[in-house]
Structures are given as C-alpha cells and as structure tokens.
C-alpha cells in the first residue's frame, strides 16, 4: 500500500491557506494573551496571525517539534500526516488544548481512543473540503478534560471550488488545473 507513512520520503508538507487559518483561529476560540505554539511554521500562515506570546517549531529551521518541551496554553497547527500518531503523543505532553487541521480519514477510532486515554477529548469539529487538497479535512479542537463532554460542537463549511492560494478555478489534486499553484509556489500570493 502506497500511503504517506510507507513512502521513503513522505510528501506531507502542505501549507495552510490564509482563509483556512482565519477559520481555525476563530473556531478554536484563540484568545490574545494565550501562549500559543505553532509547531509547523512553514511559511508562517498561522504563526504570522498570532499575537504575542507565541512560539514556533519548524524542522527546516532546525527547530524540531519533538525537541520542544515547554508547556503552552494552546497549540494551533497543520501537522504532518506521516507521523500523526507520534505527533499527537507529543502534543499531549505540551498543552491542555490544541487545534489541528487533519485529513478526514486520519481521525480514526483508534486515534480518538488513544486521545481519550490521554485525557483529551474533541470538543469541536469542523468538516471542510479545501480546494486543491486531496480529501476532506477536519479542523478539530481537543481539550484536556476530567471526563468526556456531553456534547461536541460540529460544523461544516463549503469553501467552493476556487483555489484558496491564488483564486483560480481548481480541479483538486488531479488534472491540469493544479499547475496554476505549482507555478506560483515561490510567490507570496500562492502558498502551495
């Protein structure tokens, strides 16, 4: 099976569109003054919209998330899917609340079970389809709680079929339409 996990070099460096960052920050009830960790800074789409105090990790800058051990109030990020189990495991040691955007099929019953065993529960979920991304995604907000919440807030949002990086019509991950983003990979207007 050719999954991200099994590839010699995983291709899971996917930059978060600014519009999705805005949705994430609003959805997770991020408050100014919270000490926030962005653990996959990339080009700064999330990090640049956070107010102080804030910290980041970025493997390309030698700041490995797995070497970060300082407690924070909240983690907001788009983690790499190829190492998601270990990523969650380390997340549980750093905060009492996190907001991640992950592929819909990455939120498996086993992952939720392990999350709950570590005292974390999903309190909010937002389902969306991001044009040019492979699959639907969940924005999940998880909090460390004494017991499972009685209700979970669930929402969905339709982001249309225009690329969130450059505004052009998008055919998803297949076909000729995706090339408009790859050509602009180094431009600031398009973060793909």
Regions found by a protein language model. Name each.
Residues 1-192:
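Class I S-adenosyl-L-methionine-dependent methyltransferase catalytic core
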């Amino acid at each position: 099976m050719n999954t991200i996990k099994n590839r010699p070099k995983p291709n899971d460096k996917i930059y978060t569109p600014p519009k999705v960052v805005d949705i994430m920050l609003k959805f997770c009830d991020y408050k100014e003054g919270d000490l926030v960790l962005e653990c996959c800074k990339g080009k700064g789409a999330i990090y640049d919209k956070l107010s102080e105090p804030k910290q980041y990790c970025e493997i390309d800058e030698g700041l490995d998330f797995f070497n970060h051990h300082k407690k924070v109030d909240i983690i907001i990020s788009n983690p790499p899917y190829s190492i998601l189990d270990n990523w969650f495991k380390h997340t549980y040691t750093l905060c009492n609340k996190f907001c991640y955007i992950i592929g819909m099929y990455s939120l498996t019953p086993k992952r939720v079970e392990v999350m709950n065993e570590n005292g974390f529960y999903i309190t909010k979920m937002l389902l969306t389809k991001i044009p040019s991304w492979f699959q639907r995604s969940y924005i999940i907000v998880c909090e460390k709680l004494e017991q499972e919440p009685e209700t979970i807030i669930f929402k969905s949002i339709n982001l249309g079929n225009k690329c969130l990086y450059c505004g052009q019509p998008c055919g998803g991950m297949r076909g000729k339409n995706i090339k408009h983003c790859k050509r602009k990979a180094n431009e600031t207007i398009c973060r793909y």
